[in-house]
Amino acid sequence: MEKESQENSTRPDASSTVFSSSKSTCASPSYLKEAGDLISRLPDDILQLILSYLPTRLAIKTSVLSRRWRHVWSDTWSLSFHRDRPDAPCINRILDRYRAPKMMSFRICSCCRAACISRPDTHADIDSWINFAMSRNVENLSLYLDEDKYDIPEFLYINSSLKQLYLDFGCKKDFISLNPKCSVSWTSLKNLSLYHCNISDESIAIILSGCPILESLLLFFCKKLKVLDLSKSPRLITLEITRRCRMEPTQLVAPHIRCLRLINSEKPCALVDVSSLSQAELDITAYAIVDNKLEADFHQTMVVKMLEKCQNVEKLTLGANFLKMLSLAELRGVSFPKLKAKALILETMISRYVIHGIVKVLQNSPDLKKLTIHPMGSAGSYPIPEEHIDIYLDSHGLNWDPSWSSEFKNTSRRNVESKQVASFLQLVLKTISTLELIVARLEGYIKGRRFVELRQMVPMLPRNNDVSIVLSSRRKRFRVT
């Protein structure tokens, strides 16, 4: 650092000065060099850990800093070649220079289109990269395979080091089939995620039989699977399924599952056995509405049946579309099951289209202690259009409750008022008396002046019980009562 007299004599040139956090001092180039040297003095393990969080192409650029940095990247614990990745020949050269005997994570996105990179990947390229990662006993493997007619190599199905496997075959018209022609042995695998693939009942059974300690399974837009039977996987406790229109599975047998996230589609998925379930997140999608006709009768039946299978769940999350269909079911007088939920999360904007369903769920949850309201869109950004719900109501001679219809009419984030949120909270307090805590996560939904107004309104709400209300807006939380 310069002496104090020199610091105060002239103002340093902006091109060579960076202001530090102190108001009275500045960082000169010599100071920055010293700071840089301090970083370079860190142990290799620390530097490699830092670089492992960067895309590999950026980590390699640190090699020009000094001799000390020249080979640090080549011993990092992970390699990542994603969207802005280099060509296959360049990747091969990088792998040739990689020296770490053990790899924690390998992530690669293949590209079969010449527009993406100068030379599209060949199947041989992809096979060699997978083989390289396996030769370093990789634990977390993520493959984004935007390829046509690519078959997973048989050697991938036999591996004892993999703990997490992520396979995404790209959103193409014709999905790639995951069809192991050999036995599967993933003896250390705990988390398996499959995106955009064809997988039959037989194939998933073969895969599961080779994963004795699998704990988590994710299926996103998977076809061909009819019955997902997890009864022989006692350690598999977390399941996430997102189904598109007319996609599978259609039956779920999962007696050991404790946590379920199911985003259903127009085609039903029967929950045959989910008897151990303690947490569930449920919603439906609206990918295909033909001739402006919403199959609301079918959806109402489906959501009520799903709710019945989750009667014993202690933590329940319901999405916007799910609540819209529950509201229609309530208007038609459909019987709702009694719920044992102690914590309920509502992921929906506040509107007349969900109020009836919310009130009925609250009335049927006598053990509820905590309610979280998180205004957000529907699952997968495919909300059921409200004009289709209006058409359905008109055709069946149904009407919303007049008081709720006017008070909760607006659904747009731009139109929401603090009074509307306060009225909703008041409705909740009037509906259920067992609540101990209400958390309203309003980030991005109501802010600025309206949020301040809401904070002033909430303490004035009438209530018959001692319930705390927490309002959250972006980074700040306010316990107002």
From Swiss-Prot:
GO cellular component, one term: cytoplasm
Keywords tagged on the record: Leucine-rich repeat, Repeat
Matching SUPFAM superfamilies: F-box domain (SSF81383), RNI-like (SSF52047)
The UniProt record lists the keyword Transcription: no
UniProt-listed Pfam families: F-box, LRR_At1g61320_AtMIF1
InterPro entries membership: F-box-like_dom_sf (IPR036047), F-box_AtFBL13-like (IPR053781), F-box_dom (IPR001810), F-box_plant (IPR044997), LRR_At1g61320_AtMIF1 (IPR055357), LRR_dom_sf (IPR032675)
CDD domains registered for this protein in UniProt: F-box_AtFBL13-like
Residues in F-box domain copies: 36-84
Chain residue ranges for the region called Disordered: 1-28
Compositionally biased tracts (Low complexity): 14-28
Keyword Repeat part of the UniProt annotation: yes
Name under which the protein is recorded: F-box/LRR-repeat protein At3g03360
